[in-house]
Curated annotation (Swiss-Prot):
The active site is at H89 (proton donor). Keywords: Riboflavin biosynthesis, Transferase. It holds the Pfam family DMRL_synthase. NCBIfam families: lumazine-synth, PRK00061.1-4. This is 6,7-dimethyl-8-ribityllumazine synthase. It is an enzyme of class 2 (transferase). Belongs to the DMRL synthase family.
Length: 160
């Protein structure tokens, strides 16, 4: 049986992190978690990490698409925080953000990790941005590192 799986060390990987400024008090913690994980576990150097800041979560897919189209990156991490309010706005923003980022991954055959918090309350968002429930930015970075390696390994195996 042939099993393809990746590890998380990616010293030479070039990673873009597309970050929403909206709810920045939460998103900055996600960014810190992602960068820390890329450096400590992935051994990714500072010069191989590019941060792109956009106004809100709805702008993440377009920025991610532009990054992917450049061909200069091995993967993209999208970070943001969308918190449910009293209107259906949450559903539109969260849904379109998720769908758009998935489309970028498929269109460009590039790992795009979803580190966008979609929570019902601000307390849930705080818990997921570095307190009780861990740091979802760091988790998104781990998933991305593994997918970068899985796709490289798969490419190599398919050529053999």
């Amino acid at each position: 049986m042939n099993v393809v799986q990746g590890n998380i060390e990616s010293k030479n990987a070039k990673i873009a992190i597309v970050v929403s400024r909206f709810n920045s008090f939460l998103v900055e913690s996600l960014l810190e978690g992602a960068v820390d994980t890329l450096k400590r576990f992935g051994q990714v150097s500072d010069e191989n990490i590019t941060v792109v800041r956009v106004p809100g979560a709805v702008e993440l897919p377009l920025a991610a698409r532009r990054v992917a189209a450049s061909g200069k990156f091995d993967g993209i991490i999208a970070l943001g925080a969308v918190i449910r309010g009293g209107t259906p706005h949450f559903d539109f923003v969260a849904g379109e953000c998720n769908k758009g980022l998935a489309q970028v991954a498929l269109e460009f055959d590039l790992p795009v990790s979803f580190g966008v918090l979609t929570t019902d309350t601000i307390e849930q968002a705080i818990e997921r941005s570095g307190t009780k429930a861990g740091n979802k930015g760091g988790e998104a970075a781990l998933g991305l590192l593994e997918m970068v390696n899985v796709l490289q390994e798969l490419e190599q195996q398919l050529q053999d």
